[in-house]
Amino acid sequence: PQGFFPDLSYTQLYIEFKMPEGTRVERVESDLASIEDYLLSRPEVTHVTTSVGGTPARYNLVRSIAEPTMSYGELIVDYTTPEELKASMTEIQDYLTAHYPDAYVRMKRYNLMYKKYPIELMFTGPDPAVLRELTEKAEQIMRDEPAITLVTNDWEPMTPTLMVDYYQPIARSVGLSRSDVGLSMLAATDGMPVGSFYEGVHAKPLYMKSVNSEGEKVEALDNIPVWSVLPST
């Protein structure tokens, strides 16, 4: 498809690599290292820079910026010529898709006009099951087209959800809101974000966590202490 601005004729592109949320960072680093070795084995590739956790800082403005997460990584790839870059993209994309089936891997060239995907299709409706069925049918139609090299969707993997039985009359009598209960659960599990500090240009998040008397994570969620954020009277 044509865009308002064509892709830049440049000797560099970047590769987005995204594993499902919750994937160990060691797995991400290992896969990125093997991809880097593969790319450097190709004669048209001159240099590869790898980043884990997000888009490298102070990079450039003619590209998309990824949301920070330790399940994400990037490879910035330099080529001998723009022509070699363009000629090798389909072969490399096919290799990455075949060898890393658990990951979302996409090669992207630079463009003055940001576009997430060359072709996008959106379904809306109240029933997730119907939406998933329509998505699968549309994906199959696209995969049957030889000119299309990558088909994906924005459905994230289903994950367990912790639900709290909040009984408002009793909670109000002791001054506890839904937010108080939610923050206490967050502190006992992943940790409640309370700030950040910087190591150079890199921001590191700070979390407050509830622990037992021995400094260990609280195992029984029924025993989590809950405090109100409002001062007591």
Predicted features by range, described:
Residues 61, 117-127, 167-169, 208-210:
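Short, low-order "capping/linker" segments at domain edges
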Residues 132-233:
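Beta-strand-rich non-transmembrane domains
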Residues 2-3, 60-64, 118-120, 191-196, ...:
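Short beta-alpha junctions and helix-cap segments that line functional grooves
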Residues 1-21, 104, 118, 145:
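Transmembrane helices with small-residue packing motifs
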Residues 14-16, 72-90, 120-124, 204-208, ...:
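A short beta-strand structural signal in non-transmembrane regions
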Residues 1, 27-113, 169-190:
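Solvent-exposed, membrane-proximal periplasmic/extracellular interface segments of envelope transport
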Residues 21-22, 80-84, 127-128, 168-171, ...:
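Helix N-cap motif at beta-to-alpha junctions
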Residues 10-14, 43-47, 70-74, 100-102, ...:
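Extracytoplasmic
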